């Protein structure tokens, strides 16, 4: 669960076989069966069909803040990640271990439990493949009693 006073991070390494004709989402979202185009709350990376542009989405109650984070390429591994810094209250966004932007926490989902989620959807009548290498997520602990 996102909390404004605690650090939070997410990082993944993956690839998709067709960067243009696919949609994908990967990140932390509420439990939902429609991760790509139906989630209402989360902090996740998204790419829409027909484009190679990716963005970090910070969404609460269907209101989004987005941060552009570069482009995807066919069948090429990439790392995407973010770190939420409670000191400046911003999400610091990274692609291939290089900082590409920051986003404010205005629409951070602070009233929902979030789960690691990912999905791919084809954008044409052909199978699309997402290959996940790893996903890592964590949250700052501030007391010995926290798990």
For the regions a protein language model found, what residue spans apply to each?
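Secretory/extracellular carbohydrate-interaction modules
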Residues: 1-54
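Flexible glycan-contacting loops in extracellular carbohydrate-active proteins
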Residues: 104-133
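Extended recognition patches within non-cytosolic domains
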Residues: 136-147
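Extracellular beta-strand elements of beta-rich domains used
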Residues: 80, 133-137
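Short, aromatic/His-centered strand-loop micro-motif at the edge of beta-sheets
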Residues: 58-79
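Short tryptophan-centered beta-strand motifs in secreted/extracellular beta-sheet-rich domains
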Residues: 10-12, 75-86, 91-93
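Short beta-strand segments enriched in hydrophobic/aromatic residues
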Residues: 14-16, 30, 84-86, 120-122
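Short strand-turn-strand beta-turns centered on an Asx-Gly dipeptide
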Residues: 94-98
């Amino acid at each position: 669960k996102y909390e404004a006073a605690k650090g939070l991070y997410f990082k993944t390494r993956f690839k998709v076989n067709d960067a243009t004709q696919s949609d994908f989402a990967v990140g932390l979202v509420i439990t939902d069966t429609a991760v790509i185009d139906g989630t209402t709350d989360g902090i996740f990376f998204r790419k829409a069909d027909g484009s190679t542009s990716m963005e970090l989405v910070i969404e609460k109650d269907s209101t989004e803040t987005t941060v552009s984070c570069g482009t995807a390429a066919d069948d090429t591994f990439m790392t995407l990640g973010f770190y939420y810094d409670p000191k400046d209250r911003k999400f610091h966004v990274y692609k291939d271990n290089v900082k590409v932007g920051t986003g404010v926490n205005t629409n951070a989902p602070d009233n929902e439990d979030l789960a690691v989620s990912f999905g791919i959807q084809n954008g044409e009548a052909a199978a699309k493949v997402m290959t996940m290498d790893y996903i890592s997520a964590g949250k700052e602990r501030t007391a010995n009693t926290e798990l």
